[in-house]
From Swiss-Prot:
It comes from the Bacteria. It catalyses: tRNA(Asn) + L-asparagine + ATP = L-asparaginyl-tRNA(Asn) + AMP + diphosphate + H(+). Belongs to the class-II aminoacyl-tRNA synthetase family. One of its GO terms (molecular function) is ATP binding. It holds the Pfam family tRNA-synt_2. Its main location: cytoplasm. This is Asparagine--tRNA ligase. Keywords: Aminoacyl-tRNA synthetase, ATP-binding, Cytoplasm, Ligase, Nucleotide-binding, Protein biosynthesis. InterPro entries: Aa-tRNA-synt_II (IPR004364), aa-tRNA-synth_II (IPR006195), aa-tRNA-synth_II/BPL/LPL (IPR045864), Asn-tRNA-ligase (IPR004522), Asp/Asn-tRNA-synth_IIb (IPR002312), NA-bd_OB-fold (IPR012340), NA-bd_OB_tRNA (IPR004365). Its EC number is 6.1.1.22. NCBIfam families: asnS (TIGR00457), PRK03932.1 (NF003037).
Length: 462
């Protein structure tokens, strides 16, 4: 029976025989004594195995197979290590090479590789310390998301990935079709989608929100956590075409309740990774972003500042900052606007509310001025927006008017209007992008490094 390296290091039984399985990260030798570092992914640091050729009968053929990247099963005695930087090591009794690696063609060597290079081999980059740390932090965040909502009386629901609705009204959707390409080459307006698989136009979902609202109108508090897709041709460090979204919906929640929940969730997740991923976070602090831990602690320990969009524009207009896009009332806040508010004005997270309705989604509840909506964005230092949400429009007539005003297909949304026809209630929700949170939590500068196999414009590895 073998144990994970994490368990062995957590509960070491000195002078006991242990068996580990893993991959060789490094190999060096000093005469007849060899040293290999083995990692199985369970923890950042692997464990050193000492191979003494004089004490044990190891064949020259087998020793030559011990190269970086090789998978191995090894048994030996767990002892205290005299070397600096490690408490324990294994005095090897026997080993079995499971999968050999040709050192001449293996792309990962004992050196720091650029993120650009590693993006070309996403199937292998997970074997580096950096991407191992990112993966473990992502795993912890995902687990804690479920833990948080389950502890707070939410029901987890699964919403469709294939849909006929544009949940955001932006039109940036991937089409799903089984029609022959020669038919698709014609203008889309000439295609009869009755011949298609679903008998109508179908798309990959951009949000689970609308379907989530249906369940919130019966279960009161729900959350979705799944993949979403945006056909937005943006080659930036903050956008991906496929990403995972956390979307809670709560009946009887007003905007202030929504903000309080989002703030509490964010602080809970950041506290969890600092407390439970300390080794990985220390590594990321040292090698990826200096000041990372302090940045996250600032979010955890701050009371988020709540300001209106109008106030935000006033602050930006009165600043002496030379923004790339000049701020004025009616423009959507840009990343440098958001960062100015969080990093230079308030020096902590900021919640901007009451946005102009002209660039917000159709489902957001209108304010009494009929110019702004009860939307909210949570902005954090370094990256800007990390959570976006709103109080939803629960008035049937107002929602119908807004749909018509935006020339959306009201027939496709008739089921959504039913939620207002039958037992409508105030409700709110928000979306938190997992990849953007991972990006922020780990300090990596590009969202492509926060997801195992990134999907971006002109990029579809595997």
């Amino acid at each position: 029976m073998f144990a994970s390296i994490k368990d062995i290091l957590k509960n070491p039984i000195l002078n006991s025989n242990v068996t580990i399985n893993g991959w060789i990260r490094t190999k060096r030798s000093n005469g007849k004594i060899g040293f290999i570092e083995i990692n199985d992914g369970s923890t950042l640091k692997g464990i050193q195995a000492v191979i003494n050729e004089e004490e044990n009968q190891f064949s020259e053929k087998d020793l030559k197979k011990l190269t970086t990247g090789t998978s191995i099963s090894l048994t030996g005695l767990l002892v205290e290590s005299p070397a600096k930087g490690q408490n324990y090591e294994i005095k090897t009794h026997s080993f079995n090479v499971i999968g050999e690696t040709d050192p001449e063609t293996y792309p990962l060597q004992k050196k720091r590789h650029s993120f650009e290079f590693l993006r070309e081999i996403p199937h292998l980059r997970i074997r580096t310390n950096t991407f191992g740390a990112i993966a473990r932090v992502r795993n912890k965040i995902s687990y804690k998301i479920h833990e948080y909502f389950q502890k707070n009386g939410f029901f987890y629901i699964n919403t469709p990935i294939i849909t006929s609705n544009d949940g955001e009204g932006a039109g940036e959707m991937f089409r799903v079709s089984t029609l022959k390409f020669n038919k698709l080459n014609n203008a889309l307006s000439n295609i009869d989608f009755k011949d298609d698989f679903f008998g109508k136009e179908a798309f990959l979902s951009v949000t689970g929100q609308l379907h989530g609202e249906a369940y919130a109108m019966a279960l009161s508090k729900i959350y979705t956590f799944g993949p979403t897709f945006r056909a937005e041709n943006s080659n930036t460090t903050r956008h991906a075409s496929e990403f995972w979204m956390i979307e809670p919906e709560m009946a009887f929640y007003k905007l202030n309740d929504n903000i309080a929940l989002a703030e509490d969730l964010l602080k809970y997740l950041l506290s969890s990774i600092l407390n439970e991923c300390s080794q990985d976070m220390d590594f990321l602090e040292n090698y990826i972003e200096k000041g990372l831990i302090k940045k996250l602690e600032n979010v955890i320990n701050s009371n988020f500042e709540v300001i209106t969009y109008t106030k935000a524009i006033e602050i930006l207009e009165n600043s002496k900052k030379n923004f790339e896009i000049k701020p004025y009332w009616g423009i959507d806040l840009q990343t440098d606007h958001e960062r100015y508010l969080t990093e230079e004005t308030f020096k902590k997270p900021v919640v901007v509310i009451d946005y102009p309705k002209n660039f917000k989604a159709f489902y957001m509840k209108a304010n009494k001025d009929n110019k702004t909506v009860k939307g909210m964005d949570i902005l954090v230092p370094k990256i800007g927006e990390i959570i976006g949400g709103s109080e939803r429009e629960d008035d049937l007539q107002k929602l119908e008017n807004r749909i018509k005003e935006l020339n959306l297909n009201i027939e496709h949304l008739n089921w959504y209007l039913d939620l207002r026809r039958f037992g409508s209630a105030p409700h709110s929700g928000f979306g938190l992008g997992l990849e953007r949170l991972v990006q922020y939590s780990t300090g990596i500068s590009n969202i492509r490094d926060s997801i195992p196999f990134p999907r971006t414009p002109k990029n579809l590895y595997f």
